């Protein structure tokens, strides 16, 4: 499955830890606070628990969208082309 993770976190330290966790699970940043990538259900469950621990008590809003490959393949991007990515293709 593919996921798109978007977040709004006011605290720099917490925001950086969330970004590091998303990268550690193989997701790639496509915007400042948006990550995308392929992840299996067991790892997604682990990631959700890790994000809950990281953001406990913080002013943090994280939304995880589960999307299928078709959604990734038909995404529309406006702006310069993104750098080559290993875990997802967006055009």
From Swiss-Prot:
The keyword Metal-binding applies. Its cofactor is Mg(2+). It is an enzyme of class 3 (hydrolase). InterPro entries: CRISPR_associated_Cas2, Virulence_VapD/CRISPR_Cas2. Its EC number is 3.1.-.-. GO terms for biological process: defense response to virus; maintenance of CRISPR repeat elements. Mg(2+) binds at residue 8. Keywords: Antiviral defense, Endonuclease, Hydrolase, Magnesium, Metal-binding, Nuclease. GO terms for molecular function: metal ion binding; RNA endonuclease activity. Pfam families: CRISPR_Cas2 (PF09827). The keyword Protein transport does not apply. NCBIfam families: cas2. Belongs to the CRISPR-associated endoribonuclease Cas2 protein family. Homodimer, forms a heterotetramer with a Cas1 homodimer. CRISPR (clustered regularly interspaced short palindromic repeat), is an adaptive immune system that provides protection against mobile genetic elements (viruses, transposable elements and conjugative plasmids). CRISPR clusters contain sequences complementary to antecedent mobile elements and target invading nucleic acids. CRISPR clusters are transcribed and processed into CRISPR RNA (crRNA). Functions as a ssRNA-specific endoribonuclease. Involved in the integration of spacer DNA into the CRISPR cassette. This is CRISPR-associated endoribonuclease Cas2 2. The gene is cas2-2.
